[in-house]
A protein has these predicted regions:
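Polybasic (Lys/Arg-rich)
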Residues: 55-151
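Core beta-strand-centered patch of the WYL/Sm-like small regulatory domain
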Residues: 1-64, 69-74
Length: 151
């Protein structure tokens, strides 16, 4: 790979390099890199993209540093998980009461991946993907395939 490095981040016990390549910013796990060197007479690329880049937002959208399509996902959560949602997504997203006094919804940008589905499943029946329909359907397919595995 040939990249223009911009920032190092620490996530899940590993450092990741966020760098510009192929017209966009991508991340690479540092401990898996080999033969790293600076190329002579190269110009750092991606300054405009990095200026518009928010590292914290990028990290909040991703689960386990796995990429996926970026979607605005709505989660329906039991009230007891409000703290967990704030811990994960910060205080920016609005927690909207559902009207039953027991649940709220939160809509957040997510890079949808199997790791995201695993994170949601970790809350058991207390957190559900409410939308969009294609993400909810993908969550259901994931859970169905896991259930089939353990029959």
């Amino acid at each position: 790979y040939q990249v223009s490095p911009w920032v190092l981040v620490w996530e899940n016990g590993n450092y990741y390099l966020i760098a510009y390549t192929e017209g966009r910013l991508k991340h690479y796990r540092v401990d898996k890199m080999q033969g790293v060197r600076q190329l002579p007479d190269t110009v750092r690329e991606g300054a405009e993209e990095y200026a518009a880049f928010d590292v914290n937002t990028y990290m909040q959208q991703m689960f386990g540093m796995f990429n996926g399509p970026l979607k605005k996902v709505t989660l329906q959560c039991e009230n007891r998980f409000a703290g967990a949602m704030i811990d994960r997504f910060g205080t920016g997203p609005i927690l909207s009461p559902c009207g039953d006094g027991e649940h709220f919804t939160i809509t957040v940008p997510i890079q949808v991946s199997p790791q995201f589905f695993g994170w949601v499943a970790g809350f058991g029946p207390g957190v559900a993907v409410a939308g969009p329909p294609e993400v909810r359907a993908e969550m259901k397919r994931t859970l169905d395939s896991l259930q089939d595995l353990y029959r």
